């Protein structure tokens, strides 16, 4: 079994014993790992070719070409599983998504709604309509885009790649393929990368060893954070509290050293 050696960083929650336990003294730590390629997978979260936030799409497209694509190509060459996780709607445009889908997921209307809270509350309708946010003027355009978007064509998926639509599918894939180390890239750092059921938090909860490729993502920023990409920085730090991170350059160099 081939392995590659990698130094990753994480965010420490406590200071060194010789310093006051103040937040100003919280810094990064490092760990050195040796990872079997056969137990490693690359998860590409929501790498869409369309997005309603034009600046995010432009920035994300550049990141995908400059940083994610070289990682994808290196993983394919090294025998590391490349897993596309592009949302349930988008995944179903690709035949690979059915490989780890259960029968009930393949049926029309397979997403059974929960019994509680009440349907009207979930939909913010009826007695709960007053709790709904005002409808955005661009809503219909966004919905049409959601129906038509695909994975960025230069990222694949190739026939040998995997495509999943849900966290349970990703978990079944990992179990079947023997994957325990998952590297994450994709968008957005403050939303889908963290919060999807195939995202960082859900897979950490399942016990997987997670590493974020921190220059292979970006957040959807806000007018109050745009000038310094503060949501991107905060999202990376947040994930580093429980997961690890590495740059695409560090990852690629580790794979090259084993070639």
Segments and roles (model prediction):
Residues 1-41, 54, 58-60, 69-73, ...:
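Active-site-adjacent betaalpha module
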Residues 45:
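Active-site flanking residues adjacent to catalytic metal/cofactor-binding acidic residues
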Residues 48-53:
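Short acidic, Gly/Ser-rich segments with clustered Asp/Glu that frequently serve as metal-coordination loops
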Residues 64:
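Aromatic/His-enriched, Gly/Pro-containing loop or helix-boundary segments
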Residues 82:
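Active-/binding-site microenvironments in catalytic and ligand-binding cores
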Residues 85:
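Aromatic-lined carbohydrate-recognition surfaces of secreted/lumenal glycan-active proteins
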């Amino acid at each position: 079994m081939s392995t590659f050696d990698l130094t990753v960083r994480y965010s420490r929650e406590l200071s060194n014993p010789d310093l006051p336990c103040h937040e100003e003294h919280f810094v990064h730590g490092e760990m050195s790992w040796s990872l079997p390629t056969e137990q490693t997978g690359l998860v590409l979260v929501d790498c869409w070719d369309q997005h309603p936030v034009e600046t995010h799409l432009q920035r994300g497209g550049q990141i995908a070409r400059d940083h994610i694509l070289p990682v994808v190509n290196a993983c394919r060459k090294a025998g590391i599983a490349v897993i596309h996780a592009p949302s349930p709607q988008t995944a179903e445009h690709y035949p690979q998504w059915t490989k780890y889908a259960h029968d009930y997921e393949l049926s029309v209307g397979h997403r059974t709604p929960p019994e509680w809270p009440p349907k009207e509350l979930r939909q913010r309708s009826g007695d709960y309509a007053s709790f709904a946010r005002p409808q955005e003027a661009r809503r219909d355009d966004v919905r049409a885009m959601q129906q038509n978007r695909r994975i960025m064509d230069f990222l694949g998926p190739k026939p040998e790649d995997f495509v999943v639509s849900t966290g349970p599918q990703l978990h079944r894939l990992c179990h079947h393929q023997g994957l325990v180390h998952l590297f994450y890239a994709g968008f957005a750092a403050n939303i889908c990368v963290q919060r999807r059921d195939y995202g960082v938090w859900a897979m950490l909860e399942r016990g997987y060893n997670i590493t974020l490729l921190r220059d292979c993502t970006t957040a959807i920023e806000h007018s109050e954070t745009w000038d310094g990409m503060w949501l991107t920085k905060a999202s990376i730090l947040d994930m580093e509290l429980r997961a690890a991170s590495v740059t695409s350059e560090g990852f690629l160099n580790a794979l090259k050293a084993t070639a």
